[in-house]
Amino acid sequence: MTKSELIEILARRQAHLKSDDVDLAVKSLLEMMGQALSDGDRIEIRGFGSFSLHYRPPRLGRNPKTGESVALPGKHVPHFKPGKELRERVSSVVPVDMVDAAD
């Protein structure tokens, strides 16, 4: 699901809200979450999961074109940990590629 698909679905489900208001709400939420993470804050949405930053230490990479070794610096990357309710909800879902493989 893309951001625009999410906005469209929410606008249909909440018919009393204007599509522009739903668009603004979703974009504002995502902007605030991005800002919180860039400030080093952790975001927890009970039952859904939490967003935090994980540190990736410096490592030796390789340039795929030349094969030359390249030193890559350490960095922080966003990390999502699903909550218990979300894990339980998706545990019964059969992945699409497994359904395709059965055909």
Swiss-Prot record:
Stored InterPro entries: Hist_DNA-bd (IPR000119), Histone-like_DNA-bd_CS (IPR020816), IHF-like_DNA-bd_dom_sf (IPR010992), IHF_beta (IPR005685)
Domain of life of the organism encoding this protein: Bacteria
Record-linked SMART domains: BHL
Ranges where the record places region Disordered: 62-81
Subunit structure and binding partners: Heterodimer of an alpha and a beta chain.
Recorded GO CC terms: chromosome; cytosol
Intrachain S-S bonds: none
Keywords: DNA recombination, DNA-binding, Transcription, Transcription regulation, Translation regulation
Entry keyword Hydrolase: no
Protein name: Integration host factor subunit beta
Keyword Oxidoreductase applies: no
PROSITE patterns: HISTONE_LIKE (PS00045)
Listed HAMAP family: IHF_beta
Function per UniProt: This protein is one of the two subunits of integration host factor, a specific DNA-binding protein that functions in genetic recombination as well as in transcriptional and translational control.
Pfam family name, one: Bac_DNA_binding
Naturally occurring in which organism (per UniProt): Xanthomonas campestris pv. campestris (strain ATCC 33913 / DSM 3586 / NCPPB 528 / LMG 568 / P 25)
GO molecular function: DNA binding; structural constituent of chromatin
Stated family: Belongs to the bacterial histone-like protein family.
GO biological process, any: regulation of translation
NCBIfam families per UniProt: hip, PRK00199.1
